UniProtKB/Swiss-Prot annotation:
Gene encoding the protein: murB
Domain of life: Bacteria
Record-level GO cellular component terms: cytosol
Residues in FAD-binding PCMH-type domain copies: 54-221
Requisite cofactors: FAD
The protein's name: UDP-N-acetylenolpyruvoylglucosamine reductase
Location relative to the cell: Cytoplasm
Family indicated by similarity: Belongs to the MurB family.
Entry-linked Pfam families: FAD_binding_4, MurB_C
Keywords: Cell cycle, Cell division, Cell shape, Cell wall biogenesis/degradation, Cytoplasm, FAD, Flavoprotein, NADP, Oxidoreductase, Peptidoglycan synthesis
Coiled-coil annotated spans: none
HAMAP family tied to this protein: MurB
Lineage: Bacteria, Bacillati, Cyanobacteriota, Cyanophyceae, Nostocales
Length: 331
């Protein structure tokens, strides 16, 4: 069994960013009840509603456990039936193929809780908690250190896996530990060092473990009004520099130091370039937006075109930050 934490190609998309899932199950819808839980596995669940691009086909099987026991039962079911597992958070850094995904998709969106330790300034948060909501809650307490994250449209689990960041800060800077679940049901607590963090990456990517919760170290004791105002400034900065009026996945490409991917794309004359319903955003060139009616393959082909143009002009192959799941067909 292989587990992909979410967050195909020919030619230009690096293989490390592609998980090939050939979804060719029976079209008959069914529900499988997991013994000893209030959890059910559904077949042929459309994933477009669960991704920020609002595109993508169906999951062969889909489950959204509400507690660790149900999550363990879901992994056990996948292991017993030799199913590939894909973990889905907010779907904000994910491109799902129009053909869908085979195996079992486990959504963590119902794993929700947080515990604040007001003496130490630490907060322990479940994998399904929203990063922006957490940022506002922390700000209202007057705790410093999470203001930068208010504009990241994802969940705690996904942020831990990809080492999400903004404004020269990232998850690795404040993470104390992450609790992860293995397919055999064992739970480990790992430090940032054990997670092997790098720029937008960790050892959890492509591994067979699922993040269940994370503990962050913040700095309490500040004026809540001040921290809230700072958080609002970060949010406003995102709103004025990034497109929020159309569905997107956030930044599409990693920044190839010392350049910014957005600058390279803009200097290549690609702002506004469109394939089908997918367009390079006018406001920020490292965003691809769904202008309406886009297919996942439109977005994939636009990613490929951007890579080709930038490589021809700058001899730099942009590496996607977005995770692509399923089979795609290049134009």
């Amino acid at each position: 069994m292989k587990i992909s934490q979410a967050v195909g190609n020919a030619c230009t998309v690096p293989a490390s960013n592609v998980e090939t899932h050939n979804n060719n199950p029976s079209r008959e819808s069914k529900i499988i009840y997991l013994p000893g839980t209030n959890c059910e596995i559904k077949s042929q669940a459309l994933l477009s509603a669960f991704t920020s691009y609002r595109v993508g086909g169906a999951a062969e099987l889909y489950v959204a456990p509400r507690n660790i026991e149900a999550l363990q039962a879901s992994l056990k079911y996948a292991q017993e039936h030799n199913l590939r597992v894909t973990t889905l958070g907010a779907g904000s850094n994910l491109l799902v193929s129009d053909r869908g995904i085979s195996g079992l998709v486990i959504a963590t969106r119902h794993l929700r809780y947080n515990r604040f330790d007001h003496q130490t300034g630490q907060v322990t948060v479940a994998a399904g908690e929203s990063i922006p909501s957490l940022a506002w809650e922390i700000a209202k307490l007057g705790w410093q250190g999470f203001e930068w994250a208010v504009g990241i449209p994802g969940t705690v689990g996904g942020a831990v896996v990809m080492n999400a960041g903004a404004h020269n800060s990232c998850i690795a800077d404040i993470l104390v530990s992450a609790q992860v679940l293995s397919p055999d049901g064992t739970i480990e607590t790992l430090t940032p060092e054990e997670l092997g963090y790098g720029y937008r990456t960790s050892l959890l990517q492509g591994s067979n473990r699922v993040v269940t919760q994370a503990t962050f170290q913040l700095q309490p004791g500040f004026d809540p009004a001040y921290i809230t105002a700072t958080t609002r400034e970060h949010k406003q900065m995102r709103l004025t520099t990034q497109p929020y009026n159309f569905p997107s996945c956030g930044s599409v490409f990693r920044n190839p130091k010392p350049y910014s991917a957005g600058w390279l794309i803009e200097q290549s004359g690609l702002k506004g370039y469109q394939i089908g319903g997918a367009q390079v955003a006018h406001l920020h060139a490292n965003f691809i937006v769904n202008r309406g009616g886009a297919k996942a393959n439109d977005i994939f082909c636009l990613i490929r075109h951007i890579q080709q143009e930038v490589q021809e002009r700058w001899s730099i192959l942009l590496e996607p930050e977005v995770k692509m799941l399923g089979e795609f067909q290049a134009a």
